[in-house]
């Protein structure tokens, strides 16, 4: 159903190759694929357009996009306030940041940010596909919230082909239900950032 894929901080051509045929099929039917990434990745090269902000400025870009949508499109603020928490505080945060600061932080021209925001708003339905790179900076969780809020502002939440996606890692849930009654030892964990050395250092469970 999606008519626009906003691929933000994600390189599915390398990390999610199973996703690319679906995106290519949608593009063949007229959908757009736009990549937001500081790096000109393989996915960006295969997309309709790439937007390349300064590393770590994704939250500022999301605020700039929100400012553009609020200024140039009929955002349904009363409806959003009724179905969300702290929307007034969010609007205050967006309003408090001057667009000039957004431009300075992201190293992007105003025209690019406004084009990205209004293309995302106008193309229906649109989905945001976020990657895990966005969380590798200070205020990473807040950055995800700012990006998710764009889906609410544009009205892409709760519609087929819309939404804001972040990869779900299922194994923390699975370990609670798989053969739980046959456990003889507590579950072990290995840091993802040191997966190879961590696995090499493990021993057989007792």
Question: What residue spans do the PLM features occupy?
Answer:
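Cofactor-pocket helix-loop regions in the catalytic cores of large enzyme subunits
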Residues: 1-159, 164, 168-171, 180-206
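Extracellular/periplasmic loop regions
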Residues: 174-175
């Amino acid at each position: 159903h999606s008519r626009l894929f906003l691929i933000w901080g994600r390189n599915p051509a390398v990390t999610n190759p199973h996703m690319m045929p679906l995106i290519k099929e949608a593009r063949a039917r007229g959908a757009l694929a736009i990549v937001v990434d500081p790096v000109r990745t393989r996915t960006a090269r295969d997309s309709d357009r790439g937007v390349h902000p300064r590393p770590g400025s994704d939250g500022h870009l999301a605020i700039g996009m929100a400012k553009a949508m609020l200024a140039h499109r009929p955002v349904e603020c009363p409806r959003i306030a009724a179905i969300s928490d702290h929307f007034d505080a969010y609007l205050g945060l967006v309003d408090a940041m001057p667009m000039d600061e957004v431009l300075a932080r992201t190293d992007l021209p105003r025209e690019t940010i406004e084009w990205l925001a209004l293309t995302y708003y106008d193309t229906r339905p649109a989905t945001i596909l976020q990657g895990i790179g966005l969380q590798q900076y200070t205020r990473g969780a807040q950055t995800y919230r700012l990006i998710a809020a764009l889906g609410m502002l544009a009205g892409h939440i709760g519609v087929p082909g819309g939404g804001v996606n972040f990869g779900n890692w299922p194994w923390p849930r699975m370990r609670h239900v798989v053969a739980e009654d046959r456990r003889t030892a507590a579950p072990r964990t290995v840091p993802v950032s040191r997966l190879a050395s961590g696995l090499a250092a493990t021993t057989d469970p007792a």
